[in-house]
Structure formats: structure tokens, C-alpha cells
Regions:
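TPR/TPR-like alpha-solenoid repeats
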Residues: 64, 85, 100, 121, ...
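Terminal, low-structured helical/coil segments at or just beyond the last alpha-helical repeat
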Residues: 30, 163-199
Length: 199
């Protein structure tokens, strides 16, 4: 029962975290998505640039379709554009794909695929992806239940000031022995030394 109640509380971030929009002012600037603002009147220009492989345009179109801003809401189209941006290494697009696969937004729900996208984003330091990956290890969704990995990823999110990561780490600390926590910390050191690749 305690695990169930904790899981319900921790699920709030799982849903809300993927709803952040990131936009831009300059369609042709090579800036990061965090520096951009979308104007609905630029839809044709966004689509042209996105088709040409522009990461910012792909990312922003995905957000427009996911939120229904300036276009009819269409999760499948959002997944298409997020996937193209994620394939170019955009950590936020990877995180958003994790959310969409977790909840079946525009795709069949698939925790294994969600884990793939969260992991790619988490390896780049995305704290929400780190938290969600830890949460999936805690619950055994898409991966075998593994409190050591759950603790490691929760600690990574927590170390960046992400409160939900700290809460998950605290919950896990109550469920794990001191030797299991020590093992998780050693695992984290090993993974840190290889930039979390394969962790």
C-alpha cells in the first residue's frame, strides 16, 4: 500500500513534466530551443524548415501539434516531429518522446520505448528524464525492477535540485538496506565515469 501511495504521488511529475513548451524568436538562428518563441502565422515557414532538417523547427512543430497551438492537436504528428528532433540528439525532444510513449499519446503505450528515450535524455543530464527513468526502474515498467538503478537516477535528478528526484531517493532509502544503497552509490560512480552510457 505504501508503495502504491508513493507511486501515485510520484506520478504527478511523470505527467506534468512533459508539458513544458520551448520556443524561439529567430527561425534560422542555430540557437538552442530554449531561446525561441513560436508565432502561429509562421506555420508554413516552420514546416519548410523542419522538412529541411532544422532541429528547432522540428522541435517547435512537435510542440505546436502536441498542444494544438496554431494547428489542430495531433499527437501522431507531434511524435513524428519529436522523433526527428530526438534523432538529432535533442534531449528535450527525447524526454517528450518518453512521455508520449509512457502515456500512449500518438503511439501505442510502450514502456520499453519510453525507457529508450528517457535514457538518451537522462544521459545528457535532463533531470526530468533522470527522474522518470528512476521511477520506471522503481516500478519495473519497461525494465526489470532494480532499486539500485532507480536510486542512481533519482540521485542524479536530485543533485540538480529536482525535488521529485529527492522524494524518490528518500522513498527508495526506506526500502533499501544500507549495503544496497552503498552498491547504488558505487554503481553511480562507475556510470558517471563513462558518462552514463549503457546505464
Amino acid at each position: 500500500m505504501k508503495k502504491l501511495l508513493s507511486t501515485i504521488g510520484l506520478s504527478i511529475c511523470f505527467v506534468i513534466g512533459g508539458l513544458n513548451l520551448v520556443f524561439s524568436n529567430d527561425l534560422k538562428n542555430e540557437a538552442t530551443p530554449n531561446e525561441f518563441t513560436i508565432y502561429e502565422s509562421n506555420l508554413d515557414e516552420w514546416e519548410t524548415l523542419a522538412e529541411e532538417g532544422n532541429l528547432i523547427a522540428q522541435f517547435n512543430l512537435a510542440n505546436m501539434y502536441r498542444e494544438g497551438k496554431g494547428v489542430t492537436q495531433d499527437y501522431k504528428t507531434a511524435v513524428k516531429w519529436f522523433t526527428l528532433a530526438a534523432d538529432q540528439g535533442n534531449a528535450v525532444a527525447q524526454y517528450n518522446l518518453g512521455i508520449m510513449h509512457s502515456f500512449g499519446l500518438g503511439v501505442v503505450p510502450n514502456y520499453k520505448t519510453a525507457v529508450k528515450w528517457y535514457r538518451l535524455s537522462a544521459e545528457q543530464g535532463n533531470q526530468m528524464a533522470q527522474y522518470n527513468l528512476g521511477r520506471l526502474y522503481y516500478l519495473g515498467q519497461g525494465v526489470p525492477e532494480n532499486f539500485a538503478y532507480a536510486y542512481m537516477w533519482a540521485n542524479q535528478a536530485s543533485s540538480q535540485g529536482f525535488d521529485m528526484g529527492e522524494e524518490l531517493k528518500g522513498l527508495l532509502s526506506e526500502l533499501m538496506t544500507s549495503s544496497q544503497i552503498e552498491m547504488a552509490k558505487n554503481l553511480e560512480k562507475k556510470c558517471f565515469n563513462k558518462n552514463f552510457e549503457g546505464c
